[in-house]
């Protein structure tokens, strides 16, 4: 049996309100706030900068209105943490062990050939260095606030070092190998997963990571731990980061096969899988009832308040409200603040994860 009571299955239950009460000093020390009782806002494609005007013109001439969702930019991660009080980030990761795959993208070459006036691209030459790179689509949608995974992790770590009382920060890592051009990204298999974990550990030491082993404890499986005593208390893991593998299917299965129980990333699997602790349910409209059941049973769920810019273009808040009401702990958005070109649409939670630090 769990040491704490199950959360009430009601639409008005607000995890963030519980956080605010604890921070205000009204918590019961015998029943500490658990990590799965948080509700945190984060961004989708958190590194993304919209293509420049020249690139949007080229892409629109080929794909028409399908490129509209690309016209979305995020602030630097530090600003998202500080001003936006966002606590989870999605990063698209490409292998690049030699530093040669993404340093000279087609769309930048076309702009140079045309003499187009575009913002500088990779002025420090970071893409020519070996290491995992962050971008949305090779050659085409390449602008980013962080060119490398190392720099993104280091930026968040620096903020964390200065604000060690923060609740755990979640990184959702999507391991990508797709391309629409002649660039051929490397597959995620074999030693690639060790490379990923080494890059993480080079920035975030093990004692600052909330890993599956920390949740599993002495239970036989991660699922047994979550279904039994539940996720650990927030206060035991302040100042830490947790890493979630966004991929499901074959990439996830290869990661599980290539790593041990001491792996650093949580994986999204079926609820009866031994490694079940979090699940990705991106559509809160279609899976509302399922999300509520998963949350009620102690699993962490990530869902999306909007997708492809549709909600922002029409100022449609239904999906946003359902995402919040579902109780999903990790809510992602492309619009933590309004885009004045589109509408007033944006996503904000009723209560912050912690007081402002500015």
Predicted regions and their residues:
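Bacterial N-terminal signal peptides
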Residues: 14-24
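Basic/polar N-terminal segments that are highly enriched at the extreme N-terminus
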Residues: 1-6, 26-30
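Bacterial N-terminal signal peptides that target proteins for export
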Residues: 3-16
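Catalytic cores of phosphodiester-bond hydrolases, prominently lipid phosphodiesterases
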Residues: 28-358
């Amino acid at each position: 049996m769990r040491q704490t009571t199950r959360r009430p299955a009601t639409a008005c239950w607000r995890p963030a309100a519980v956080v605010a009460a604890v921070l205000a000093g009204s918590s019961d020390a015998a029943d500490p706030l658990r990590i799965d009782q948080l509700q945190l806002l984060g961004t989708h494609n958190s590194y993304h900068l919209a293509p420049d005007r020249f690139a949007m013109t080229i892409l629109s001439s080929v794909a028409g209105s399908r490129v509209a969702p690309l016209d979305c930019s995020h602030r630097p991660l530090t600003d998202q943490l500080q001003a936006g009080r966002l606590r989870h980030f999605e990063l698209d990761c490409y292998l690049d062990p030699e530093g040669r795959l993404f340093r000279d993208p087609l769309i930048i070459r076309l702009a140079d050939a045309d003499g187009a006036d575009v913002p500088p691209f990779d002025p420090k030459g970071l893409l020519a260095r070996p290491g995992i790179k962050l971008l949305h689509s090779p050659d085409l949608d390449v602008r980013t606030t962080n060119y490398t995974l190392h720099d993104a992790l280091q930026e968040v770590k620096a903020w964390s070092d200065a604000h060690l009382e923060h609740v755990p920060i979640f990184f959702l890592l999507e391991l990508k190998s797709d391309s629409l051009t002649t660039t051929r990204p490397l597959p995620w298999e074999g030693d690639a997963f060790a490379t990923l974990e080494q890059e993480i550990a080079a920035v975030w030491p093990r004692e600052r990571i909330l890993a599956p082993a920390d949740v599993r404890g002495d239970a036989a499986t991660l699922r047994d731990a979550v279904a039994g005593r539940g996720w650990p208390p927030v206060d035991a893991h302040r100042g830490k980061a947790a890493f979630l593998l966004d991929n499901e299917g074959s990439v996830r299965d290869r990661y599980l096969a290539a790593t041990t129980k001491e792996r650093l990333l949580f994986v999204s699997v079926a609820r009866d899988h031994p490694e079940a602790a979090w699940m990705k349910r991106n559509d809160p409209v279609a899976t509302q009832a399922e999300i509520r059941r998963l949350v009620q049973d102690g699993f962490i769920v990530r869902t999306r308040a909007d997708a492809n810019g549709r909600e922002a273009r029409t100022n449609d808040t239904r999906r946003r409200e359902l995402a919040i009401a579902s109780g999903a702990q990790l809510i992602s958005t492309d619009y933590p603040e309004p885009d004045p070109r589109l509408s007033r649409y944006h996503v904000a939670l009723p209560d912050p994860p912690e007081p402002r630090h500015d």
